[in-house]
A protein has these predicted regions:
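Residue(s) in the substrate-gating loop at a strand-loop-helix junction
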Residues: 83
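C-terminal helical subdomain
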Residues: 123-124, 143-186
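The beta1-alpha1 cofactor-binding region of Rossmann-like NAD(H)/NADP(H)-dependent oxidoreductases
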Residues: 2-13, 45
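Active-site helix of classical SDR
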Residues: 63, 100
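A glycine-rich helix->loop->beta "capping" turn
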Residues: 17-28, 36, 120
Length: 187
């Protein structure tokens, strides 16, 4: 089912389809993201809007779609993909991206406080992972910097294993955060 995470109705339709197909939903992984890196002085306002729409609103729309279901079934697990840039500002050029990823961490932690107990929350903070994320910038100099940075990337299945680890824990164990990056990555 094609889903645009910037549209709450699309995300709700995806969740509804999962419930109608499988009878329930156990886990939501908010994984969509955009990393449009450029110095603030470049005023890439349209890219800022897209990052906010995808990286923050997309997470909120996912939560809004599953939370009533999880509360009704007294179980569920929401996993949000943040970034190491949500722990330390990625600069130069990553100020807005980092802001969106700090927001994802805050939303995940706030959600844990609000609905903890039967509903688990996990924030995954990836470093350089081999994915399409590195292609999000229209700023040439920043894009070259990002491509150089991603030469150290580890395979995306590293993230899949981290997510599986969080999901596979007993119901009374909540893995709140996982930071995962290449061993050679300093940032």
């Amino acid at each position: 089912l094609k889903t645009d995470v910037t549209k709450a109705a699309d995300v709700k339709a995806l969740v509804d389809k999962a419930v109608s197909s499988f009878g329930k939903i156990d886990v939501l992984i908010n994984n969509a993201g955009l990393m449009a890196i450029a110095p603030l002085s470049e005023t890439k306002v349209e890219e800022w809007d897209k990052m906010i729409d995808i990286n923050i609103k997309g997470v909120l729309y996912g939560i809004a779609a599953v939370l009533p279901i999880f509360q009704n079934q007294s179980s569920g697990h929401i996993i949000n993909l943040s970034s190491v840039a949500g722990i330390k500002v990625f600069s130069p050029g990553g100020t807005v991206y980092s802001g969106t990823k700090y927001a994802v961490r805050a939303i995940t932690e706030g959600l844990r406080h609000e609905v903890g107990g039967a509903i688990r929350t996990t924030s995954i903070e990836p470093g350089a992972i081999d994915s399409e994320l590195k292609h999000g910038s229209s700023h040439e100099e920043s894009s070259a910097h990002v491509k150089e940075f991603y030469k150290q990337a580890i395979p995306s299945d590293s993230i899949a294993r981290a997510i599986a680890y969080a999901i596979e824990q007993p119901d009374d164990v909540d893995v709140n955060e996982i930071v995962i990056r290449p061993t050679v990555q300093e940032f």
